[in-house]
Amino acid sequence: MSLLSATPVVAVIGGGPAGLMAAETLAAAGVPVDLFDAMPSVGRKFLLAGVGGMNITHAEEQSAFRQRYRERESGVSPWLDSFDSNALRAWIHELGIETFVGTSGRVFPADMKAAPLLRAWLHRLREQGVRIHTRSRWLGWDAEGRLRLAIPEGERLLQPQATVLALGGGSWPRLGSDGAWQALLAARGVELRPLEPANCGFEVAGWSDFLKTRYAGAPIKPAALALPGQPPRQGEFVLTDTGIEGSLVYALSAEIRTAIERDGQATLTLDLAPQRDLAELGRALARPRGSQSLANHLRRHAGIDGARAALLRELAPPETFQDMGRLAQACKAVPLTVVRARPLAEAISSAGGVPLEALDDGLMLRQLPGVFCAGEMLDWEAPTGGYLLTACFASGRAAGQGVLRWLAAGGSSA
C-alpha cells in the first residue's frame, strides 16, 4: 500500500448527484477536490432514472413540496432553504439545459434525457478542477484514520482534511449503491438504521395462475388505493407476477411498509371506478342485462374490463357477481392485501441509513469529525416525482457548504 502522490484537501466518495454536487460546491469555492467512485463511470443510477423521461424535480408550491418528506420534513428543509426546486431548475439552465413542467407538475429536461445533463455537469466539474477517479472503491479507514481505496493497481491511502461520503442507499446495487458502507461506519461506532425498500412493489399471498399468465405487466388505471383511516389516492399501478407496483403504490409505500411491520400485512381498499360515485354506478349496473354476458355488462355500464375486470374477479368473493348492488360496492371498495415488500435491490430508493440526528447542521458525523454524509445514505425518504433527486442535490450542496465552514474554522480529519 502507498499514499497517493497528491493527497486531496477534500475527498468525495461517490459519484451520484449528491457527491457531484458536493464536489461542485467545494470546487466553486476554490477547494481542491478528488472524487472517487467504485464503478467504471459516475452517475449510473442517475442515468437509469432518465430512462423513460428524466423527472428532475417538481414545480409544486414549496410548503407542499417539503411535506413530501413526511416525518423528515424538518431535517430536509434546511437543505432546501439554500437549494430548493427553483434553484435546481436555475442551476440546470446554467448548464445549458432547458426544462419544462409537465401536466402533473413534474419537471423534466426539454429533451427528457439525463445523459446531456450529466455530460454538461461533468464538463463543468473538470473545468473547475475536480479530479474524478473511477474504479476506486472505498474500503474504510486504516488504523491511523487514513482512507483506504481499492484501485486497479492495488490499494492506496489518503488523508484528506475532510471527506464527504455520498455512497447511496441499497437499491440497484449493480449500479454502485450496494450499502457496503454500513459495516464500515458501524465499525467506527456510527449507529445506523437498517436499509429498507422505499418506492417499491409489494407482494400478495399469491395470484391465480390465470391472472399471472394473462395480466402480469398490465396497468390498472384509473384506480384509487387507500389504507385504513386515510383518504384514497388516485393514479395507476401495474400487476406483477407477485403483486403490485407502480407510481400509485410507490406513493403509499412508506405507509404500507409501516402497516406490514406492525400487523404482518397491509390491506388496502381498491377503487376500480374512482371517477364515479357508488350510487351512480349502482344504478348503471342495475340496468337489465338481457342476453349479454356479465363481462360485457360490466364493461358497458361500469367501464371495467380487461386487467381491471380480472383483478376484480380475483379479489371479490364469487357471490359478489350474483348481486349488482354488491358488485357496485366491490367496484368501489374491494380489499387488496399485500404481505411483504419486494427486495431492496429492486426498489427505486431506500429508507434507513445514517440518522439525521447523527449529523450536525453541516451534515458532519458527530462521531467522526471531518467526515460528512449526503444523499440517499441518510435516513430520509420521499415519493417519486422529483423529490428524491431534489433532496440528493440539496444535501450534496449542504454537505459541501458544511465542509467549507469546517475548513474555514481550521478543522481537519483525525
Task: Label every model-predicted segment.
Residues 162-208:
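Glycine-rich loop(s) and the adjacent beta-strand/alpha-helix scaffold that form part
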Residues 76-84, 103-123, 172-177, 203-205, ...:
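Short beta-strand to alpha-helix junction loop
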Residues 171-184, 188, 379-411:
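A conserved FAD-binding loop/helix module that cradles the flavin
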Residues 27-51:
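Glycine-rich FAD pyrophosphate-binding loop
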Residues 134-146:
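A conserved short coil-to-beta-strand element within the FAD-binding core of flavoproteins
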Residues 28-29, 41, 62-64, 81, ...:
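Residue-level recognition of phosphate/Mg2+-coordinating polar/acidic sites
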Residues 8-35, 403-404:
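N-terminal Rossmann-like FAD-binding beta1-loop-alpha1 element of flavoenzymes
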Residues 11-13, 36, 138, 157-173, ...:
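Short hydrophobic core segments
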